[in-house]
Amino acid sequence: MAAPGARSCNLSGLLPAQTSLEYALLDAVTQEEKDGLVYQYLQKVDGWEQDLLVPEFPEGLEWLNTEEPISVYKDLCGKVVILDFFTYCCINCIHLLPDLHALEHTYSDKDGLLIVGVHSAKFPNEKVLDNIRSAVLRYNITHPVVNDADASLWQELEVSCWPTLIILGPRGNMLFSLIGEGHKEKLFLYTSIALKYYKDRGQIRANKIGIKLYKDSLPPSPLLFPGKITVDHVSNRLVIADTGHHRILVVWKNGQIQYSIGGPNPGRKDGIFSESSFNSPQGVAIMNNIIYVADTENHLIRKIDLEAEMVSTVAGIGIQGTDKEGGAKGDEQPISSPWDVVFGRSGPEVQRDNILWIAMAGTHQIWALLLDCGRLPKKNELKKGTCLRFAGSGNEENRNNAYPHKAGFAQPSGLSLASEGPWSCLFVADSESSTVRTVSLKDGAVKHLVGGERDPMNLFAFGDVDGVGINARLQHPLGVTWDQKRNLLYVADSYNHKIKVVDPKTKNCTTLAGTGNASNMIGSSFTDSTFNEPGGLCIGENGQLLYVADTNNHQIKVLDLETKTVSVFPVFRSENAVVDGPCLAGKPKTLPKLPKSAPGIRLAPVAASPGQTLQFKLRLDLPSGTKLTEGASSCWFLSAEGNEWLLQGQIPSGEIESISNQPTISLQIPGDCLSLEAILSISVFLYYCSSDSSACMMKGILFSQPLQITDTQQDCIPPVELKYIF
C-alpha cells in the first residue's frame, strides 16, 4: 500500500504537469534549456503538498535477479527508480531493452539509479515464473524483475500499454511516465536531471541492492534458446540459429558441427567467420552454400558465404528503423526486428529463387529483399538489392484485406512458402494475434487461416483449442513449415508448448505433439512428449522428419512423422567432443540427467564384501538398420545417490565406441563401508543414426543394482550382464 497521506496513486495525477513540460521541451533549442526545464519541473512536483506515491510491492510476489524481495520504501529509498512494465512477448518491450541497457551502463545503483522490471503478462503462459526466467535470460535482463502475475500494480497505477516506464524519486514519488518505445532521449534526459536534482539535495543513497543474476548459475549448454532451424536439402545439413549464443551453426544430419559462426557474445561485425558476430539471430534460409540470417536485435539481414567463409550485411543499417514503406538499396534501408526469412520467386516464369521474404516483426509487416532483378505483385520492375514492404500497413492488427498494404499483422514471427498450386502463398505465424495467415503470391491478398477472431483490433483471442478456422485457438505461435508431400502445415504453437498441424484445404487445426505442459520429456508417442515454447521448425527433405527448435529446453527435437516417435537431435563438435549431450570431455562435475522416457531396469541383488571388485558387462543392441553416431560420445556413468562413499566421491564414466566391442565396467567396494545396503546406478547414453544418417537419436537407460555389503568374503562374483534392446 502507499504511504499515509499519499495522493491518488495512478498515472493520471502526473498527466497535466508532464504534458506542460513536454510542450515546453518542443520549443527548447539547446541542451541547457532542456535541462533547465526538467529541473524546474522537478522543483514543481517535488514541492507538491502530497507526494504522488506508488504502492508497495505486494507481499508474496516472485522475484528474479535478486537475493530477496525488494521493498519500495525500504530498499529503494534514496534511489531514482525506473519501473519497466513489460510482457516478454511484446516486440515493443524488446525494442526498449537496449535503451535500458544503455542507461544501466551509464548509471549504476551506486550512482543512485535502479531499474526494476514489472512483468505484467498478456498471455497465461507468461505468468509462469520459469517462462519469465527464460525470457530474462534470452534478453540478457540484468536488473531485478518482479512477476506481477495478477497485474495488481498495473491496475492500481492505471497502466494501459506495454511498455510503460514510470520514473520514481527517492521517496517512491512518481516523477515521469513514458508510454511505448522510442523515447531514449527523454529517458536519459529525465533520469540524468532527476539524479542531479536529488543529489543536489542530499537525498541520493549509494547503497548497493542485492543483485543475484540467474544466468551466473546456468550450467554450460551447447545450444541456448535455439530460435529457428532450416534444412539444406542439397548437402544433407541443418542450419540452426543458436539464438542465446548469438551464433549460427551448420551441422551435418548426424549432428556433427561443420561451422560455428559468431558467438558467444552479441556483436555486429562483418568479415571472416572467426571475427564476425550477431545479436540474437532468428530466421535462417540456405541456398547454394549461402545462408541468409534474420539478425534480429541488430535489425539486419546478414549473408553467410560458406565457401568464402565470410559474413556480410545485405539489409538494414544496424539501428532500429521506423520506415514502413522501404524501397532503398538493402544496406541503406533501415529495418526493424526481422524474425524469419524464406526464399521465393517473383513469378512463375522465374526459374530460381530471387526474393528473400522477411517477417518484419518490429513493424508488423512482411517485407521482401530482391536477390536479383524482378517484380512483386502489382509492382514495377525492381533492382537487385531493393528492400521494401510487401504486405501490412504497419498497424498492429489482425486485419485481412485483398489489398496487401491495407492488411494488418501483429508481430509476424514465422514464414513458410507453398509455391505450388492451388496454394501459391506465404504462410505467416502472426504471433500477437495468435493466428496463422496467408499472403497470396499472385496479388498479395492477406487471408485468415486459423486462430484469432473476426474483430481485427482484438489481439486477445487466444487459447488451446483444436478446431476449424476461426474456432481453433492458438497462443502466440512463432513458427510454421509447409509439408509439400502431405499438403499440410505444421505450426509451432509456442505458448501452448505444442506442435499443431493444419490442413489448409479444410482449415482444420489439430494437435500433433505435446501435452500443453512446459517440460522436457521424450514420451512413447507424440502426445506423450513435451516441449517448452518451441520457436521454429522445418520439414526434412523426404518429408519423414520434422525438426523442432525446442527453444526453452535448449534442444532440437526430431519428430518422425512415419513412426510417430520423438528423439533429441545430437549436436557435437568435429573433434569428437559432444556439445549437445551428457558425455563431455573429461569427467562431469555434476550428474547429467537421463531423458524422462529412459527405461529403468532393476537387477537382482548382489552380495559383496569390502575390497571385492564387481564387474558389469554392457550388452546393448541397436534397432535394425542403425549404427552408433560417428563422432558422438555414447557413454556410461555410475552414481550412488545417498551412498556416495561407494564411489569415493567420484563419478566413474567412460565411452562406448563400438556395439561389437562394448566395455566392461569395474567397481571395487571401498574398505571403509558406511552402509550395509546401497543401490548403484549405471546410466547409459547412446547416440545412433539410421544407416543413411537421415535420422539421429539419443536414447538412455538406467540399470539399478542393489548391493548387500557383508563382512563374509564372497567367492568370485560373476560379472553382471547389462542387457537391453533399444
Swiss-Prot record:
User: Where does this polypeptide localize?
Assistant: Cytoplasm, Cytosol
Please give an example of a GO cellular component term from this record.
Answer: cytosol
**The keyword Plastid appears for this protein:** no
> Which UniProt keywords are present, listed alphabetically?
Cytoplasm, Repeat
Quote any Pfam family the record assigns: Thioredoxin_8
Which segments carry the NHL repeats? 212-254, 265-307, 335-369, 409-439, 461-505, 518-562
What SUPFAM superfamilies does the annotation carry? NHL repeat, Thioredoxin-like
Q: What is the role of the protein in this entry?
A: Required for normal embryonic development.
How is this protein organized at the quaternary level? Monomer.
Any idea what this protein is called? NHL repeat-containing protein 2
Species whose genome carries this gene:
Bos taurus (Bovine)
